[in-house]
Amino acid sequence: YESFGWDIPTYVHCSPVMRDQHNKMSKRHGDPSYEDLKAQGYLTDAILNYVALLGWAPKGERSEQEIFSLSELVEDFNIAGISKSPAIFDIEKLTYFNATYLRALAPEAFAKAAEPYIRQSVKNPAMDASAIAALLQARCEKLTDIPEKVDFFDKLPDYDVEFFTNKKSKTNAEVSRDMLE
């Protein structure tokens, strides 16, 4: 570096990210990469926020804060907050972060992100994807949860007539039909 007239960089050791108490995360063992997490329906901001907090803790007034914008992470990051002990990757915690980010999105942004997943199950173009997205925003933890939540829009499931019978209320299929009308 000195030969080129460059400043000597400061090297920092970051502890490994572990899959459990005894094993490092590794693609060889099927642990997810960033692309895998994106394909599983996680938002980039949620992944960044979670990974940033794996081996680092903010100091000061934001020491208790979990959800950060990218600009807040950049502003608050300090090498002194890096942990010396390994961090354990918890997919449930990442899912919590992702659900928080999904719910915080503007309705239009959520509708745009959700539309491809809605269209996987709802093939009818007459169905308004943004109206469906408005119903889903508070109910999804990952974008990939959406297709299974909306698959009934195109084809209603077949219900057994016994479903409408209740002995306590003394209803049968005929009475139930009248009540529904």
Where are these regions (language model features)?
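Alpha-helical recognition segments enriched in aromatics with Gly/Pro capping
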Residues: 1-102, 115-116
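Small-residue-rich helix-loop
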Residues: 107-181
